[in-house]
C-alpha cells in the first residue's frame, strides 16, 4: 500500500511539473507573438512616417522595430529610405549592411546597390555635387562605366570646376554615344576656358 501511495504521489508531482512547463512555453509563445505584433505596428508606423517625409520619427519607429525583431528585413529597407530622406547617406548603407549580416536575406544585399543609385540621384537632383562624387564613383564600381553614370559624374566634376576629371571620365565612356561626344566637347571647352582664365 505504501508503494502504491508513493507511486501516485510521484505521478501527481510529475503531472504538476508538466503543466507548469506547458504554461511557461505558452507564456514565451505569447510574448513572442506580442513582440512580433508590436514590431509589425512599429514598421507600419515608420513606413507611414517615411511617406509623410517625417524622417526623424520614421527612424525612431523603425529602430525600435528592429530592436524588437532583428530579423525583420523590410524594416531595414524602410530605415535606409528614412536615412536617405534625412540626408544620412552613410547610415543608409550601414543599416542595410548590418541587416544583411544579421538576416542573410539576399534582398538586403541587392537593396544596397539600389541605395547607392538612389543616393546618387538625390544628390545630383539637389545639386550637392561635392557629396555626390564619391557616391557616383561607387556607382561606377557597381554598374561599370555606363553612359548615364559617366554623364552624371562628369556633370558633378564640372559643377565643382574640376574639368580635368570631367574630361577623363567622359574619355572612359562609350565614344560612339552622341551624348558622350557632346558632353566631352563641352567639358573640353570649359576646361580650356578655365585654364585660360
What is each PLM-predicted segment?
Residues 14-17:
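C-terminal motif of bacterial Sec signal peptides marking the signal peptidase cleavage site
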Residues 51-52, 85-86, 118, 122-126, ...:
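Register position in tetratricopeptide repeats
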Residues 44, 78, 111-118, 152, ...:
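Canonical tetratricopeptide repeat
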Residues 40, 74, 107-110, 114, ...:
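Start-of-helix register in tetratricopeptide repeats
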Residues 36, 70, 104, 144, ...:
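Short coil turns that delineate tetratricopeptide repeat
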Residues 64-65, 98-99, 138-139, 172-173:
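Canonical positions in the second alpha-helix
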